C-alpha cells in the first residue's frame, strides 16, 4: 500500500510523535494551520470515517480530547477545534482527526518548538510512548 499515513504509523523516525498505542498515533501536523495542530491517525488503514469501527473512532476522540487539553494548557489557549474531513475535503485517504487549538490564529511558532512545549507539558507516565 502506498498510503502516507500507513507509512507514518510504521516509521517512528519521520515524525514528531506525541503519543502512540495499538490503535492510534498522535503527531504534530507537518503543515500546521495553527500552533499545536495535531493529527490523531488510526494505525489500521480506514479510508474514511464511514469505514472505521466505532471502537476505533471512540478511541480516537478519547485520545484527541486528552491531548487537546494538554495542547491548550501549554499554549495558553482556551478553545480547540476537532475536524475529520470526508469526501472532496479529504486530501489523504486515511482516517485522521485534526486537533487545532485556537483554530483562527495562524502559526507563530515552528512545529519543533511547539512539539518541545507539548512534550515538556506531559507528565512522566504520558512520556512513555
Predicted regions and their residues:
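HIT superfamily nucleotide-processing domains
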Residues: 1-129
Amino acid at each position: 500500500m502506498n498510503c502516507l499515513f500507513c507509512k507514518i504509523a510504521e516509521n517512528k523516525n519521520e515524525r514528531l510523535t506525541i503519543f502512540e498505542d495499538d490503535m492510534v498515533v498522535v503527531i504534530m501536523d507537518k503543515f500546521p494551520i495553527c500552533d499545536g495542530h495535531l493529527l490523531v491517525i488510526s494505525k489500521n488503514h480506514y479510508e474514511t470515517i464511514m469505514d472505521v469501527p466505532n471502537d476505533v473512532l471512540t478511541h480516537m476522540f478519547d485520545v484527541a480530547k486528552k491531548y487537546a487539553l494538554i495542547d491548550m494548557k501549554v499554549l495558553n489557549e482556551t478553545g480547540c477545534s476537532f475536524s475529520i474531513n470526508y469526501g472532496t475535503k479529504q486530501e489523504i485517504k486515511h482516517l485522521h482527526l485534526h486537533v487545532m487549538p485556537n483554530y483562527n490564529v495562524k502559526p507563530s511558532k515552528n512545529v519543533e518548538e511547539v512539539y518541545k512545549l507539548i512534550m515538556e507539558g506531559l507528565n512522566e507516565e504520558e512520556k512513555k510512548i
